[in-house]
Amino acid sequence: MLARMSFALLCACLVATPALAKNKTDFSCTGVFGPDSSEALLIETYGADNVVTGQVPGAEGMEAQATTVFPNDPDKAMQFGWMDNEARQGLGYVDLPPSIDGPHGVHVGMTVAEVLAINGKPFAIGGFWWDYGGYAQIAEGTLANADDATCFLSLRFSPADDYQPDLDTSSVAGEVSIPTDEPLLEKLDTRVSTVSVSFPDVGD
């Protein structure tokens, strides 16, 4: 679990922003999405039949414990990781579903161009097709790191599965940094595949 959590927090630090709660498209790091969240609160909020805790796949073939809400509904499924696995409380991260907008309105399914429009500044994306690929690396703009943020936003991008077989994708594969003006991103129909909000470990 420590490996899964450390990875989630590391990726979150690449794209950090304070969460607001002013309108429909803003996200608030409070309640079930706040640092004091717990499995008990999820059950109270969503119902016991919709909350399942167990092992979930992680990077490099590892598994970690997490709580999934609405596990049988891809449009609503949310995954929660806990700072305290035994008590299942203290939110470490939550992966948001396509039906919920994250901070500043970002959500699963957005194109690179759409995220770029929100950010207002170019950024980079890690190369694809490996365990740690596809994460946004944003240094400037609306979604850039905020030192005083109470929670952190991490975006992961993925290319479409069905692209032209003769397309040379070597420049966007593996441990490389891809600028947002790379034409291949559009040709591959690259979109946000994960919107994750994480919290710092207050014990660090």
What do the predicted segments below correspond to?
Residues 1-7:
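Bacterial N-terminal signal peptides that target proteins for export
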